[in-house]
């Protein structure tokens, strides 16, 4: 017993019996007393209760298993005696003595003082992966020195290239990772112009003297002593990473788990595993990738130090690790993330080498997945979309690929344009419109299904179980349906007659010119050619505005808005050209670009016109206060009576311009002379406008009271460039801007669905309304453009017009109330 692990324990202990260690199942009952037996009568048994398989030849003396924390007893050469205490133990390979008698080695009623430690060792993996433990470990990393790369959440360690690309969501996102192709170097991954880009951080050693040198990091020109310093410079100064790409980084993509978890998941893997999916951070119960023990792999694993025990248990790769206790692993509810192939083990295996004495493996619920060829080539298996707990385990190609694969091409895949016959077959495919295709279509045969590049067709393919072409060379063993088996009817010839009652889909027209034509506008108030801000025209417009009731003004605004947004007075021909029944649907579609530009043009022009109405009052302070009072009353009517949130937002935008808000004397006069109006503006209109622009319109406005919804957040988001740093709205500078943007997009979907409701509300509100010709002309966009910029300036570029008029408004504001002059001290 000198070689035993417990030979030094005192023999007078009531639990000191030279039996093999018991498993946790032995705690269920303890009925019969324990009887001492000879230690050499039993074979070594793992502490997890799994009996070893018998190999050919004499049983070898093995060292402790990787999953055994205490050890096993040595073999004995003496004959084994049957123990009456050991019953109902299932053996995988029962050993035979010289007489062919089978023996068992476990006692169900056996107790051992190391049992609690065994139980702890089984649950140690679960305890190490709790969210609290991971959060604490992440906080410890982030509390390191700022010059330590691990203290920055944008550093993700050794993650594959494709995983880093999947983490990029918008332009400006970035992270830093270790280079898998050249260990020791770092790569900055970012997104710019909707394309992920990778920049290797150059690492140079500067030798200051024979005994001292330092490492510096750089992209192109300037070098830095540390990577955090480099990132701070490029983020803070908005400096392009390279002059050729022009990529700018400003939004870090932070990790949500400690680097240890990323190392365990991706550290030992090859870049090929990057195609398996994006990083599932924040899920500590995610599955470990495991595989079965094959042959003599156990001997190689024993050479690892004990300090790497967790890595041994959680080893991933096609070079498999050891699974001693499958039932314990199934208790952890491990989920398998499947890859391209799905290879069950337990059927016919590839013959092993004669030197490795293995017996046929019984049917097992364990599966192996990886990117190796299938073990059974005759069977074609389909990829499953989900995996039940404990059903599948996967491997990787960590040691099968000595060098990294070629990097994916950044150029977009060239595909054939979609066939116009698709538009003739379905009304749902007008989202990707090309006006040149209909004219060039000559009745040729339709393109293969895989060449269609429509999002609607992709969804249809997924619903039917088929997939199109992929942007990779990987074979997924999926039998795609042959396109030739699909029935297709050719479009009718030009000479064929179609019944009048038969509905035919007419391809929408892609508008390329604005509906506002200032020079072609026939006006009763403006001459054929006029200069910007003519005094006579300003006085006439102000006279009409001052002498009219606020409700009448609001009705005229609503009438013009409904025509511009194509809510009312939409002809049948216009509906066919749009492809939809309302402009509220058109602005949500890709080819509604021109209508969105027109809506933005009218909104900005209206806001500037209101600001000119206030700042153009060169008379007394009381006149400006009266004009301000009338404008606020019109805003109240638009909000409560008309339900025109579009014009309401234009008035609120004008009142919140810096050139208007700085007029302290004017606002003070408003509070003194029109106290109720000032209170109404501060307590109701401003909070209501804020709620609208935060996407909470449905919580404060009844749907049956809205005739024109809030349009500007949606059209601004859809028409803005990929990245802008100036001209953002107030809600975009909020901490919850992402959630607010999602609310606006969800509201746009509801707005398109309820287009008929808005139309009926507008018709009900404007029932019996008789517009005044002159006032209707004043509130038309063409008139306002001619009045503000003149007949020639109205044709200038929109951005240039707005910039120049912003300077004019600033000059008018300073003329009315000059800024205080700072006295110089001598």
Curated annotation (Swiss-Prot):
Main localisation: cytoplasm
Keyword Phosphoprotein appears in the UniProt entry: yes
GO molecular function, one term: phosphotyrosine residue binding
Residue stretches making up the Ras-GEF domain: 549-819
Pfam families referenced in this protein's UniProt entry, alphabetically: RasGEF (PF00617), SH2 (PF00017)
InterPro entries hit by this protein: Ras_GEF_dom_sf, RASGEF_cat_dom, RASGEF_cat_dom_sf, SH2, SH2-Ras-GEF_adapter, SH2_dom_sf, SH2_SHEP1/BCAR3/NSP1
PTM-bearing positions, type Phosphoserine: 32, 78, 83, 182, 291, 359, 364, 376, 472
Site (Required for interaction with NEDD9): 749
Annotated GO biological process: endothelin receptor signaling pathway; epidermal growth factor receptor signaling pathway; insulin receptor signaling pathway; positive regulation of cell population proliferation; positive regulation of GTPase activity; positive regulation of MAPK cascade; small GTPase-mediated signal transduction
Residues with PTM N-acetylalanine: 2
Compartments where found: Cytoplasm; Cell junction, Focal adhesion
Maturation and modification: Phosphorylated on tyrosine residues.
Ranges of Polar residues composition bias in the record: 350-361
CC terms in the record's Gene Ontology section: cytoplasm; focal adhesion; membrane
Oligomeric form and interacting partners: Part of a complex comprised of PTPRA, BCAR1, BCAR3 (via SH2 domain) and SRC; the formation of the complex is dependent on integrin mediated-tyrosine phosphorylation of PTPRA. Within the complex, interacts (via SH2 domain) with PTPRA (when phosphorylated on 'Tyr-797'). Interacts (via Ras-GEF domain) with BCAR1. Interacts (via Ras-GEF domain) with NEDD9. Interacts with PTK2/FAK1. Interacts with PTPN1. Interacts (via SH2 domain) with EGFR (when tyrosine-phosphorylated).
Domain free text: The SH2 domain mediates interaction with tyrosine-phosphorylated proteins. However, not involved in the binding to phosphorylated BCAR1. Required for cell cycle progression in response to INS/insulin. Required for regulation of EGF-induced DNA synthesis. The Ras-GEF domain appears to adopt a closed conformation rendering it incapable of carrying out canonical exchange factor function, this closed conformation is probably required for interaction with BCAR1.
Purpose: Acts as an adapter protein downstream of several growth factor receptors to promote cell proliferation, migration, and redistribution of actin fibers. Specifically involved in INS/insulin signaling pathway by mediating MAPK1/ERK2-MAPK3/ERK1 activation and DNA synthesis. Promotes insulin-mediated membrane ruffling. In response to vasoconstrictor peptide EDN1, involved in the activation of RAP1 downstream of PTK2B via interaction with phosphorylated BCAR1.
Record protein name field: Breast cancer anti-estrogen resistance protein 3 homolog
